[in-house]
């Protein structure tokens, strides 16, 4: 752990920042702290397509098409992640590499902050906190990495790492710049900033009044600035949050049954936060640091009320972002609370436990990627099908494509446009859910040269950066035509289904298996909701048909050539070598399309 440095020899100087620190166990300190970052870089590279989910895809499309920074609600930290990919746009890189740079740029920035505090400031505890801020409480939100508080908290840690040192007053300007970035990152950053300064304040280590005065003036100025120029989104959220006449969500807090729901949610998804909170309370009480105990516990429970007076807890990307402030509230006191020197064995155990937590959280992020990988695969399947129909603007029925992992949210049209542009601007397509097309009469008020950017926002096609995107002028076409399948039985012998199953599955599991359906006839298979067209399957063993739990998966798009999609399959309890057959059901009748795949069930 880093030592709390309070000697004149440790003042911040440029020469000191360039000098390599001499830690104990130098080889370990040169390698181990970087391992989590290597994993984060690898994940960001491998999952770059998935990291344009929701707001992330919105900002990417904005800076690519506007060819400049896109900042909303004065949250200027948003520009940090846009610097590197925007340079790529300016020099004309392919969009694949722009998306890759965008994914990596988030990790690059936090890694630079880590290097600055860990080596430049010799503060290993702050470096460890920055790693924790990139892993704890994050799974779904790894795919919306631009969330402003994910920037505000590491900057807050950097601010505190400098603040704890002795420094000449002119260094305050660096802190004030950091303070502005922190406070303008997110409204909740104001709460976290006050929390940290209150937690830090002690008579023994208090700084001269002029330091607090400078920080306080900037804080008041930031509050006034936000008050007068607050965007509609923020003002609307705050007005609703504290209007307890219209917002009655807080009433759930007087229902004893809700605390069971809240407790189970916290235990399942935030157990490390609860454990850290208990350790902090015990540590502060044992040291009789009652003011700090009041600050930590008061902030924790005040934020519990704030969250639950606006939301009902549930696992989601948005809820992860709402819950994120609990991470700095408990881990900043915990990590800084460990003594800088003492029994080496205890310090080693502490470092080992924190390292295990980081490794565990990295594993959670990796295994949580499965639904996002499937989601991207489904988008690419729909893009392929859309291209076969001709045109570039499509709608899809959410009733037939929702596979659970689909997450058919407002950014779906944006994400499909970005993903399709990887193959070339001339074959770009955008696919919107049907609900978006009919939202507030979009289908009637939209011109032929417009497209759905978000369900509540239409864009002219001339707005697009022609280097990367081109959409044809014309109406939206459906991927799920409602034309009746009158002659479908006559084309069954000209259809094939290829099953891309794994070779081994566990008995009684339920899995998604990719299949490719090939229609070699001139008659399409129409997948409209009311056409009752499904993919289903049955199992055989030595040519004997097994009893099985039939699951029907709606055909996600019309088939006029080749169409790929996933089918949900229940693995039977029988173990051994089995055969899986997939077929199409139309009005409860099997078409008898040939398909067969050998599978080992264990």
Question: What is each residue range found by the language model?
Answer:
Residues 1-41, 337, 341-342, 579:
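Start-transfer (signal-anchor) and selected internal transmembrane alpha helices
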Residues 288-300, 337-362:
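Signature aromatic-anchored transmembrane alpha helix within multi-pass, membrane-resident enzymes
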Residues 104-124:
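Transmembrane-helix motifs of polytopic, lipid-linked glycan transferases
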Residues 354-428, 434, 452, 491:
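Membrane-embedded, lumen/periplasm-facing catalytic core of multi-pass transferases
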Residues 311-342:
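Hydrophobic/aromatic-rich transmembrane helices and adjacent perimembrane loops
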Residues 40-106, 111, 139-149, 180-281, ...:
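Transmembrane catalytic cores of multi-pass membrane glycosyltransferases
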């Amino acid at each position: 752990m880093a030592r709390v440095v309070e000697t004149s020899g440790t003042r911040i100087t440029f020469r000191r920042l360039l000098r390599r620190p001499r830690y104990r166990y130098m080889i370990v300190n040169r390698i181990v702290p970087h391992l989590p970052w290597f994993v984060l870089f690898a994940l960001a590279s491998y999952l770059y397509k998935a990291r344009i989910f929701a707001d992330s895809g919105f900002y990417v499309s904005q800076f690519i098409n506007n060819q400049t920074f896109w900042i909303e609600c004065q949250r200027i930290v948003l520009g940090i992640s846009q610097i590197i990919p925007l340079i790529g746009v300016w020099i004309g890189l392919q969009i694949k590499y722009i998306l890759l740079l965008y994914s990596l740029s988030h990790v690059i920035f936090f890694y630079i902050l880590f290097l600055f505090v860990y080596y430049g400031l010799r503060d290993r505890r702050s470096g460890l906190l920055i790693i924790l801020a990139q892993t704890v409480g994050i799974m779904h939100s790894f795919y919306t990495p631009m969330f402003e508080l994910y920037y505000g908290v590491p900057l807050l840690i950097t601010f505190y790492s400098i603040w704890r040192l002795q420094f000449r007053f002119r260094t305050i300007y660096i802190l004030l710049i950091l303070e502005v970035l922190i406070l303008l990152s997110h409204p909740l950053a104001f709460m976290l900033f006050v929390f940290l300064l209150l937690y830090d304040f002690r008579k023994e280590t208090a700084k001269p009044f002029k330091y607090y005065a400078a920080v306080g003036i900037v804080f008041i100025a930031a509050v006034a600035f936000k008050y007068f120029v607050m965007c509609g989104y923020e003002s609307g959220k705050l007005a609703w949050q504290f209007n307890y006449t219209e917002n009655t969500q807080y009433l759930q807090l007087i229902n004893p049954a809700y605390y069971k729901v809240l407790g189970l949610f916290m235990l399942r998804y935030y157990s490390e936060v609860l454990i850290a909170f208990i350790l902090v309370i015990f540590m502060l009480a044992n040291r009789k640091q009652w003011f700090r105990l009041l600050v930590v516990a008061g902030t924790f429970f005040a934020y519990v009320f704030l969250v639950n007076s606006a939301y009902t807890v549930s696992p989601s990307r948005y809820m992860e972002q709402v819950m994120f402030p609990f991470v700095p509230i408990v881990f900043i006191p915990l990590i800084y609370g460990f003594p800088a020197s003492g029994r080496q064995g205890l310090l080693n155990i502490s470092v080992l436990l924190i390292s295990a937590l980081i490794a565990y959280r990295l594993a959670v992020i990796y295994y949580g990627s499965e639904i996002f990988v499937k989601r991207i695969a489904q988008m690419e399947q729909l893009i392929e099908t859309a291209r076969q129909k001709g045109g570039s603007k499509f709608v899809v029925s959410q009733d037939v494509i929702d596979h659970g992992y689909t997450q058919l949210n407002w950014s779906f049209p944006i994400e499909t446009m970005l993903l399709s542009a990887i193959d070339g601007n001339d074959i770009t397509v955008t696919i919107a859910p049907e609900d978006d097309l009919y939202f507030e009469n979009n289908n009637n008020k939209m011109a032929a040269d417009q497209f759905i950017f978000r369900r509540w926002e239409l864009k002219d096609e001339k707005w697009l950066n022609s280097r990367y995107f081109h959409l044809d002028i014309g109406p939206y076409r459906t991927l799920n035509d409602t034309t009746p399948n009158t002659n479908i039985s006559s084309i069954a012998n000209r259809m094939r289904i290829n099953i891309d199953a794994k070779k081994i599955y566990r008995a009684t599991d339920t899995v998604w298996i990719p299949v490719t359906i090939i229609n070699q006839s001139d008659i399409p298979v129409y997948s409209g909701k009311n056409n009752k067209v499904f993919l289903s399957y049955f199992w055989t063993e030595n040519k004997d048909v097994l009893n099985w739990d039939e699951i029907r998966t709606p055909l996600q798009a019309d088939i006029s050539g080749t169409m790929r999609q996933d089918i949900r399959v229940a693995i039977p309890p029988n173990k051994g070598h089995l055969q899986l057959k997939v077929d199409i059901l139309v009005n409860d009748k099997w078409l008898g399309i040939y398909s067969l795949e050998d599978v080992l069930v264990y």
